[in-house]
Amino acid sequence: MSSVPAPREYFLDSIRAWLMLLGIPFHISLIYSTHSWHVNSAAPSWWLTLFNDFIHAFRMQVFFVISGYFSYMLFLRYPLKHWWKVRVERVGIPMLTAIPLLTLPQFILLQYVKEKTENWPTLSAYEKYNTLAWELISHLWFLLVLVILTTVSIGIFTWFQKRQETSKPRPAAISLAKLSLIFFLLGVAYAAIRRIIFIVYPAILSDGMFNFIVMQTLFYVPFFILGALAFIHPDLKVRFTTPSRGCTLGAAVAFIAYLLNQRYGSGDAWMYETESVITMVMGLWMVNVVFSLGHRLLNFQSARVTYFVNASLFIYLVHHPLTLFFGAYITPHISSNLIGFLCGLIFVMGIALILYEIHLRIPLLKFLFSGKPPVKRESRATIG
């Protein structure tokens, strides 16, 4: 445990917040894309589909690298049990709060919008369970994965810490090219696991809890560990914060490959396995692109940025039902996809910010949506 706090990484705080907030244009553009979603516009937009695909191809990989970085930083700062308790509370409490307050009403709304209320009684017990798993976890899946990664990383982080204490500090002798090869092989390994499951027991891939707990965790654990290694080895972080032409070009080529796979791939063939390899390496390269841009443009303290850093989780949690409401009841009345997209951003962000300000004034809601217990202020006693 370290008593000396690490210097504040303003650019990482900012990147994490903006990646979270990027979920808003991501889901609103999904309404106007060619992808089938809960609600869709009458006519899809090719450029909003392209925008949506680009965000989807890298956003969460970079997010989990930052999560791993901060998780290990705090692991060194606090006793093990306290670290685990705090980390799980910070993500677990908001997730459990959002299910009854946000995703359950969202599920009920969609049942009426999609006229499925009459079909619900005809579903089997497992079909009801699986539907609820997908719909109630919904956009909260990354919080569940963070709880799992935090628990799994106890042993990994402890091993990292012991190695730091017993070994002399030395540079991480690994280049971005070697990292690219490693992540390519990790993508192939993940694709192989998925293919084996598809051959042996394909039905399990449609199970919501299996998807969130097993498949999503397996895919994102390398990025989480990479974040911890970037904290342990400052020179590795420097590689990510230093612009790399190779990573930029590689990410561009990977995105083109991603689009081609989306266009010509087949779910019954190798589309999902190919996508996992592409997004694994593209995620790594985009860590360099995003970190280097963020380090240059966002590495400063600002009250406005701090506000959105603090508000980002709450805004992300509430934006999803607001987006679905907009798509179901407002989108059909706007003929232009561009105007609809912009109106959606204003509608969702505006209401989300109002709700954020309201929840700050209600201590119970503030605790439930942040997982942070209220700070006890010591009363000033007059001595004399």
Swiss-Prot record:
It comes from the Bacteria. Pfam families: Acyl_transf_3. One of its GO terms (molecular function) is transferase activity, transferring one-carbon groups. The chain crosses the membrane at residues 17-37, 54-74, 91-111, 140-160, 173-193, 212-232, 240-260, 274-294, 311-331, 338-358. Its EC number is 2.1.-.-. InterPro entries: Acyl_transf_3_dom (IPR002656), Glucan_succinyl_AcylTrfase (IPR050623), Glucans_biosynth_C (IPR023723). One of its GO terms (biological process) is glucan biosynthetic process. Keywords: Acyltransferase, Cell membrane, Membrane, Transferase, Transmembrane, Transmembrane helix. It is a multi-pass membrane protein. NCBIfam families: PRK03854.1. Belongs to the acyltransferase 3 family. OpgC subfamily. This is Glucans biosynthesis protein C. It comes from Salmonella newport (strain SL254).
